[in-house]
Swiss-Prot record:
Belongs to the chorismate synthase family. The keyword Lyase applies. It catalyses: 5-O-(1-carboxyvinyl)-3-phosphoshikimate = chorismate + phosphate. Gene3D superfamilies: Chorismate synthase AroC. Reduced FMN (FMNH(2)). It comes from Chlorobaculum parvum (strain DSM 263 / NCIMB 8327) (Chlorobium vibrioforme subsp. thiosulfatophilum). GO terms for cellular component: cytosol. GO terms for biological process: amino acid biosynthetic process; aromatic amino acid family biosynthetic process; chorismate biosynthetic process. Keywords: Amino-acid biosynthesis, Aromatic amino acid biosynthesis, FAD, Flavoprotein, FMN, Lyase, NADP. This is Chorismate synthase. The gene is aroC.
């Protein structure tokens, strides 16, 4: 089972991630991790923090000579902005008398609920842990599983279809060709645009909408389209709720800050149509023995992968920190006031696509790995047989002519 944990505050010394359960023998480079971190920092509409930070992961354990060794992989991403926050975010020195407490919650944020839940007298701890800055650690963690899946022929990619009032009228004409080449080709094409949209005219309109929102002191949300290609039929299961692939993927996507909705394929559009216009008909023939002319199920039927590209759509709400603030009240005095502004982005939808790619990899929540275990097992069964042969040969003083690519999986 692969799982990960993150730690760290937005303005603390560093973010960290521990990935547990990675198979031994998975080839990795520093670029596999840091390239994904760089992608997360891109995107039109980002705030001033991106000019301060240049995220790079420092691997502390679990990798040797460019391959995982089966033990937990620990990584740290330093926060350059920490030097400006050593007093208000000090771990042990009690500087509370020098620091002005934040007692005005921002509507739409975790400020109020976190303040009440944990019994704080200052909102700062809530702000710093609930911040989407934490997703840098998740992208680093997800990059390990992405490298593993890539070696199994599975690719993950995304693009943006909607930013605020601007939407692509239909799926890009190039989408089928890009998916045939693998979802990473789709991601590479999207990355050419500062808003990660495929259509140039739509990209320009989205940039203009972001500029207008910034001028108005407002923010914009949008819709992320995630695709997973190369997934064989049968990943997931209908047998138990915690092995359902669509459930696991939806949970992973919904764990991302500011994501408020998720669907597999065009699910909400399908809900308005009769079944005869929704379900993907089956035809004998083709390379895999069957073929379909449509993929309205989004690559998942009966909570299992159908062998078609998996398609996940995620709705991101507008960021809650507004230059032109909404009404709130002071928790210390109960006085009605305008909400406060915390340095933030105007639009982070392009970056959300990168985070979504990371969390759908099997290093995301435990159910996702449970769903994929059967397929991973079948893909690696030859390696497992070789492990037994290696032991048998070792007893005889012999050596295998071919070593398994992946030696063990917990």
């Amino acid at each position: 089972m692969i799982r990960y944990f993150t730690a760290g505050e937005s303005h603390g010394p560093a973010l960290s991630a521990i990935v547990e359960g990675m198979p031994a023998g998975v080839a990795l480079t520093e670029s596999d991790i840091n390239d994904q971190l760089a992608r997360r920092q891109q995107g039109y509409g980002r705030g001033g923090r991106m000019k301060i930070e240049t995220d790079r992961a420092e691997v502390l354990s679990g990798i040797r000579f460019g391959k995982t060794i089966g033990s937990p992989v620990a990584m740290v991403i330093r926060n350059r902005d920490w030097e400006n926050w050593t007093v208000p975010m000090a771990q042990f020195d009690d500087n509370s008398a020098e620091v002005q407490k934040i007692t005005i919650p921002r509507p739409g944020h975790a400020d109020l609920t976190g303040f009440v839940k944990y019994g704080f007298d200052d909102i700062r701890p809530v702000i710093d842990r609930s911040s989407a800055r934490e997703t840098a650690a998740r992208v680093a963690a997800g990059s390990l599983a992405r490298a593993f899946l890539r070696q199994l022929g599975i690719q993950i990619g995304s693009y943006i279809s909607t930013i605020g009032p601007v939407s692509e009228a239909s799926a890009p004409a190039a989408l089928p060709e890009l998916l045939d080449a693998g979802a990473e080709s789709l991601a590479a094409e999207a990355d050419k645009s500062p808003v990660r949209m495929i259509d140039p005219a739509t990209s320009e309109a989205a940039i203009a909408a972001i500029d207008q929102a910034k001028a108005d002191g407002d923010t914009l949300g949008g819709i992320v389209e995630v695709y997973i290609t190369g997934v064989p039929m049968g990943l997931g299961s209908y047998v138990q709720h915690d092995r359902r692939l669509d459930s696991a993927l939806a949970a992973a996507i919904m764990s991302i800050q500011a994501i408020k909705g998720v669907e597999i394929g065009p699910a909400f559009d399908n809900a308005r149509k009769p079944g005869s216009e929704v379900h993907d008909e089956l035809f004998a023939g083709g390379e895999k023995g069957l073929r379909r002319k449509t993929n309205r199920a989004g690559g998942i039927e009966g909570s299992m992968s159908s062998g078609q590209p998996i398609h996940i759509r995620a709705a991101m709400k507008p960021i809650s920190s507004l230059v032109s603030p909404l009404r709130s009240f002071d928790l210390a005095t109960l006085e009605a006031v305008q909400s406060r502004f915390e340095r933030s982005d105007t639009c982070a939808v392009p970056a959300a696509g990168i985070v979504a790619e990371a969390v759908v990899a099997p290093s995301s929540p435990t159910p996702c790995w449970k769903s994929s275990a059967e397929i991973i097992w079948r893909r690696l069964r030859k390696g497992w047989r070789l492990i037994g042969k290696r032991y048998e040969y070792a007893l005889q003083g012999k050596k295998l002519r071919r070593e398994p690519e992946v030696f063990a999986i917990d």
